[in-house]
Amino acid sequence: RTPKDYYELIPSFSRNTNIIEDQIEMTKKILDGADKDAFTMGTLHGMCASGIHPLERMGEGYNYDQVRQMQVDFLRWDEKKMLDSMERIADGMCILAERYIKDAGVDSVYYAGLGAETRWYTDEEFAKWIKPFDLKIMKAIKDAGGYCFLHMCKSGLNMKRYDEDYAALSDVVNWGVYEAPMSLEDGKKQFPGKTILGGLENRSGVLVDGDEYDVRREV
């Protein structure tokens, strides 16, 4: 498999592309059954995650680590073809973000950023290959009138990659304090003036084994 194969796999997106239409219709149906006073949120996998999903279709049995490494290797192999492909993906995500807010009527978008793990990209590669797309999509969320929730995925992160440019486009910031190397207190310093969203472990601990009292105490 080569970057050329990837390039040929990625389509151009429009407002009426089937996958976008389907997502908006599904979102509308969910909102129809929700409390009208509820604060609502759509989710977008970030540029890095959305960019690896096509790689999963390029071969049988590729696991997560393999496609993560393929993305890095392909970018180092043929930067132009990969960035052209990723631009098309980002354009589709911008359209979906806008339609989430303007057409479906959600209040916010939870943007799940990925790529800051030091095991994959260098700081320079992240800044060149991932960050510009992240910011483009986050700006589309803001321009559409929605609140932007930035989630910083995974462990082993260089949290400094999510710098003031990310902060400027975020209303709320969230990360896994149980795995990312940053406490809530340090996060408040890195993202001054932003709402910090905490959370609990979701694969073990009180959410899995505790009762209501345990959950309340942990919160």
Which residues does each PLM region occupy?
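Alpha/beta catalytic barrel-like cores
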Residues: 1-18
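Active-site loop segments of alpha/beta catalytic cores
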Residues: 14-219
